[in-house]
Each structure stands twice: as C-alpha cells, then as structure tokens.
Amino acid sequence: MSDFEKLQETVYQLLELVGENPDREGLLDTPKRVAKMYQEVFSGLGRDPKDEFTAVFSEGHEEVVLVKDIPFHSMCEHHLLPFYGVAHVAYLPSNGKVTGLSKLARAVEVASKRPQLQERLTAQIATALDEALSPEGVFVMVEAEHMCMTMRGIKKPGSKTITTVAKGIYKENVHQRQEILSMIHHD
C-alpha cells in the first residue's frame, strides 16, 4: 500500500472515529481529496528553502532589498490547523550580491509548506537567506492568524501573531532595524 493510499485510509478511519459515515454521498471522495491536500500543503517537507536561491547576481547594489506582504499559509504542528498571513523579507547586500526577487517568495513558500511553528518559519527563512547570500544583514517579519486560536481553545478570531528574526547589521544596529521596520509599515 502506497503512502497516498495509507493517508486515504487514515482519513477514512478518522471520519469513522468522529462519528461520521465516510460512505455517505458527500464524503465518498473526501479521503482522496484530503490526501491530495496534505501532499500539497506539506510539499516543503524534505526541501531546504536555501536551495531556492539559485540565481545570485553581482549587481553592485549596496542598499536595502525588501519584498513585503508575501502571502503564505502553513499548518500549525500542534493542531494541524492552518495559520496564514504575510512575510516581509529584507536584506542588505554584501559586495553588491543580490538574488532574484521571486527567490525570496519561493523560500517563504518552501519553508511554510510543512507542519510548522511560526517562530521556526521566521528563523528558517532568515537563515536560508543569510546562508545563501552572506549579506550584511537579514530581517524577516512574519504576521499570521492561527486557526488554532480562532476555531478552538481561546477562540480569538482576528488576533495576529508577529515574529521577527534579525541577523547581522539588523541585529546589531537599532537604527538599521528601525529603517527596515518603517519600510515594512509604510504603505
């Protein structure tokens, strides 16, 4: 039995265990749909976000590069419920070395497609960029709403969790960090 078939069977059993009839008309294809969905939302497993930085250019650019409001969704590893929001990814090039802007979004995508904690997600994005480019500094901010806080437990819809990771000059120099924060919050 393949992993995909095992996953379908597990979803079928889950439906039975919660008191549902997995053989009723509306649920007949649900195990297959859920198995496909999990393959998609966990497609970052076994992949390194650093590998997304395949295009590196010497452009002589010495100022901040920021891609903000990168949408993402991930799955909380504690409850397997979604969390979603935006990531802001900035770096200060070293020796003019830059990467394609889409590579920043791709790294966010790979890191988010796995059972995850927001704190770890933020760190994985920052570390991947730092290791791939060796820039003067990296700053990553992730803002997300967690369904585990909305649908269950404390039930606080609309609450946002914000996590940051600063490396290099953005960790060492408060003025540099303030510049990035003002750019992120500028519309």
Curated annotation (Swiss-Prot):
Top enzyme class: hydrolase
Biological or metabolic pathway of the protein: Cofactor biosynthesis; 7,8-dihydroneopterin triphosphate biosynthesis; 7,8-dihydroneopterin triphosphate from GTP: step 1/1
GO biological process, one term: tetrahydrofolate biosynthetic process
PANTHER family, sorted: GTP CYCLOHYDROLASE 1, GTP CYCLOHYDROLASE I
Domain of life, per lineage: Bacteria
One GO CC term on file: cytoplasm
Name of the gene encoding the protein in the UniProt record: folE
Enzyme Commission code: 3.5.4.16
Entry similarity comment: Belongs to the GTP cyclohydrolase I family.
A molecular-function term among this protein's GO annotations: GTP binding
Record-linked InterPro entries: GTP-CH-I_C/QueF, GTP-CH-I_N, GTP_CycHdrlase_I, GTP_CycHdrlase_I_CS, GTP_CycHdrlase_I_dom
Catalyses which reaction(s): GTP + H2O = 7,8-dihydroneopterin 3'-triphosphate + formate + H(+)
Name assigned to this protein: GTP cyclohydrolase 1
UniProt keyword Nucleotide-binding present: yes
Protein residues bound to Zn(2+): C76, H79, C148
Keywords assigned by UniProt, alphabetized: GTP-binding, Hydrolase, Metal-binding, Nucleotide-binding, One-carbon metabolism, Zinc
The protein's assembly and partners: Homomer.
